[in-house]
């Protein structure tokens, strides 16, 4: 009998190892993530990358070699690989982190490369972006520099739902640079409430949004009890 816990643990470990291998092997292709699913014909592997042509290779040689590696070293049965580009690469933190790392390895100044990254992210419609570059960036002593624009959530539900975070490593002559990219996706926050006018009162069908700052909870049971007391007092007066 197959141990269910061991089975799912092994599947999860394989998925993580494949993801780490692809991130290390194809970071210059702006690797964004992968999905692995079992099919009757074998294993379907979907790879997301900002530059799919690098993973596919000339005449498909690179992707064929990758299929052999996944089958031999990761025990994926008959892997069928599909490489596609994310819907909006500029809103994917992993893509932008690897893109920034490659830019630094090409010799661009870290501050210029970071500003270019933030500008591309914000032009794509993000609510906020933050880039942290650490290492021997200005002297022999390691330090870090943080650049930020817009809204970047640090705690709460918005951090889990709206924020995408990724790290990458750039290897230079001065040493290793650590890169961290944080993106606040253009999603609707929970403190925004849309007010729509009814057909009878609206003039142009306009709608607006308000931001809730203070919320006061009203106990309706107290109002009901108060109405009952007032109603009882009025009945007593009428009877008298």
From Swiss-Prot:
Complexes and interactors: Part of the 30S ribosomal subunit.
Keywords: Ribonucleoprotein, Ribosomal protein, RNA-binding, rRNA-binding
UniProt keyword RNA-binding present: yes
Its job: Binds the lower part of the 30S subunit head.
Signal peptide range in chain numbering: none
GO molecular function, one term: rRNA binding
KH type-2 domain sequence ranges: 18-97
Pfam hit, one: KH_2
Protein name: Small ribosomal subunit protein uS3
UniProt organism field: Metallosphaera sedula (strain ATCC 51363 / DSM 5348 / JCM 9185 / NBRC 15509 / TH2)
Record-linked PROSITE patterns: KH_TYPE_2 (PS50823)
